[in-house]
Swiss-Prot record:
Main subcellular location of this protein, as a coarse class: endoplasmic reticulum
Residue stretches spanning the membrane: 37-57, 70-90, 92-112, 154-170, 180-200, 253-273, 279-299, 323-343, 364-384, 401-421, 458-478, 483-503
Location in the cell: Endoplasmic reticulum membrane
Record protein name field: GPI-anchored wall transfer protein 1
Keywords of the record: Acyltransferase, Endoplasmic reticulum, Glycoprotein, GPI-anchor biosynthesis, Membrane, Transferase, Transmembrane, Transmembrane helix
GO molecular function list: glucosaminyl-phosphatidylinositol O-acyltransferase activity
Originating gene: GWT1
A single GO BP: GPI anchor biosynthetic process
Source organism of this protein record: Chaetomium globosum (strain ATCC 6205 / CBS 148.51 / DSM 1962 / NBRC 6347 / NRRL 1970) (Soil fungus)
Membrane topology: Multi-pass membrane protein
Matching InterPro entries: PIGW/GWT1
Length: 512
């Protein structure tokens, strides 16, 4: 009897000493150091390379028109499947995956005809685009295919990673870094904010085109209408995580804070900063100024030590990562808004001031994107280089100046890559003379899958979060092997894509 009691006591002690599954999951995403910037760039490069292959199929073979079930399957495999492979089975060899995608892209482009002149032949305009008699001239702003492809790919990768990170197949170096370093998911968070900034420039451009200015009070009221749904989602996520005893990574945003709160507080602060344009007439200038000031405060006060090692005794200290990193995300948003001011206007006048042809305006757009990419990359190198620069280290937890510059430089370069693909393979589609022709030309040059993700991005992101929670509550993700992991992730992305494309087909836009 005594032996039985001893055995039970030993078993109970062993169970108490062994970590719970929740603790194992929290440890699985904690204390990570990330990977190299070069490898992350190679993974990110898969998206524009896939765009090149898709565009070659469309420009040379009109493969995705009409958009039948086969076209959808190929569209899904390229724009979702290839990105899924880049962070799972090909995560250790992203350069190889890029090569495997480039080879068929080149083959498709050059195999159209044995006649060299036919190979260089530009895609023909759609019938509507060739007509100049259609009513309704296009407006001052346009929705460019390369911008949709960029934002759609960003959303696809984000949705993949938020679930894939819970499986062992997803490399730990791609998961969010604890404090110092770079990772793919750190880039993804910043890219989401940057992309939101790009599209947020549209109402500002409309105001300028109409020659009007909205008072600050009106801008604040409008911004609050955008903020309230996001803040409500943040509260719902907070209550669900606490109520379901879901695994948490406290040092990511804090005890109560989450990414929805960060997104929700951006609009009113951006509305305030718009008034500062009278002093600093550039969103990029405001972004750099804010980032530099924030970094100076981090380096010259106790703020950095407080964020990284302070006790959690009150609401501010419990959520210090989310609250103070907000300034970094605000700078990223403003930088994205500056890019939007560049890429959204229909006509970009060359530097010589002459109206120019369609080709010259498109070259001007690409050159200015290239110029800004070079500027951001140079600033990032000056900020992080130990020999010729400041020698600072990237920290997503702080959202410090190196992190801001890394995110903006990478996204500027990515957008430039998509713009080059667009310019090279679909130059003729931008000669449309009316709104109807331009719309048809846009659909011809844009992936239906990426267009669907771009159209209802925030709603799909919310659905992805719900499905991620559902999978984690029903599956012990740490115990799943490679093949079942791919099956779960593939099914999850198929559901998200099906919902996104279904909403797009029925012309439904969910605004949050």
């Amino acid at each position: 009897m005594a032996n039985l009691a001893d055995d039970l006591a030993a078993t109970a002690a062993k169970a108490a000493a062994s970590p719970s599954y929740k603790q194992l999951k929290e440890d699985f995403v904690s204390n990570l150091s990330g990977g190299s910037v070069v490898e992350i760039a190679q993974v990110c490069a898969v998206a524009p390379v896939v765009s090149l292959l898709w565009s070659a199929l469309q420009a040379r073979q009109t493969f995705f028109k009409p958009y039948n079930p086969l076209a959808f399957v190929v569209d899904f495999l390229l724009n979702v499947g290839a990105l899924l492979l880049s962070v799972t089975l090909y995560s250790s060899v992203p350069l190889l995956l890029n090569i495997l995608l480039l080879v068929p892209a080149a083959a498709v482009y050059f195999s159209l005809s044995d006649n060299p002149s036919a190979r260089r032949k530009k895609p023909q305009l759609p019938p509507n685009a060739q007509s100049k008699a259609s009513p309704g001239p296009p407006g001052a702003l346009s929705t460019k295919p390369f911008l949709t492809n960029y934002r759609g790919n960003m959303m696809v990768v984000t949705c993949i990673c938020i679930l894939a990170v819970d499986f062992r197949l997803f490399p730990r170096r791609y998961a969010k870094v604890e404090t110092w370093g770079t990772s793919l998911m750190d880039m993804g968070v910043g890219s989401f904010v940057y992309s939101a900034g790009v599209v947020a420039s549209r109402p500002v451009l409309k105001e300028r085109a109409d020659g009007r200015s909205t008072p600050l009070a009106t801008r604040l009221v409008r911004s609050l209408r955008h903020s309230l749904p996001l803040l409500a989602l943040g509260v719902v996520r907070l209550l669900s995580v606490k109520g379901l005893d879901y695994a948490e990574h406290v040092t990511e945003y804090g005890v109560h804070w989450n990414f929805f709160f960060t997104l929700g507080f951006l609009p009113p602060f951006v509305a305030l900063f718009q008034s500062a344009l009278r002093l600093v007439p550039s969103y990029a200038g405001l972004a750099i100024l804010l980032g530099v000031l924030y970094q100076v405060v981090l380096e010259t006060t106790e703020l950095k030590a407080y964020i990284l090692a302070g006790p959690r005794t009150d609401f501010l200290s419990m959520n210090r990562e989310g609250i103070f990193s907000f300034f970094g995300y605000l700078a990223i948003f403003l930088a994205g808004q500056d890019t939007g001011m560049l890429v959204l206007p229909r006509s970009l006048v060359p530097r010589d001031g002459a109206p120019g042809t369609t080709g010259s305006r498109r070259r001007a757009l690409v050159l200015r994107l290239a110029g800004w990419s070079a500027i951001w990359i140079t600033l990032y190198l000056l900020c992080t280089d130990y020999t010729y620069g400041a020698g600072l280290t990237v920290s997503r937890r702080l959202a410090n100046l190196p992190y801001i510059l890394w995110v903006v430089a990478s996204n500027s370069a990515l957008m430039l890559s998509f713009a080059l693909v667009d310019t090279f393979l679909f130059p003729a589609f931008y000669k449309a003379q009316d709104a109807k022709a331009e719309k048809e030309a846009y659909h011809t040059a844009t992936s239906r899958v990426l267009q669907a993700y771009n159209r209802n991005g925030l709603a799909i992101f919310l659905l992805a979060n719900l499905l991620t929670g559902l999978v984690n509550m029903t599956v012990r993700t740490l115990d799943v092997g490679r093949i079942p992991t791919m099956g779960i992730l593939g099914g999850y992305m198929a559901v998200l894509t099906g919902v996104a494309v279904g909403l797009d087909m029925y012309n439904i836009t969910i605004k949050l």
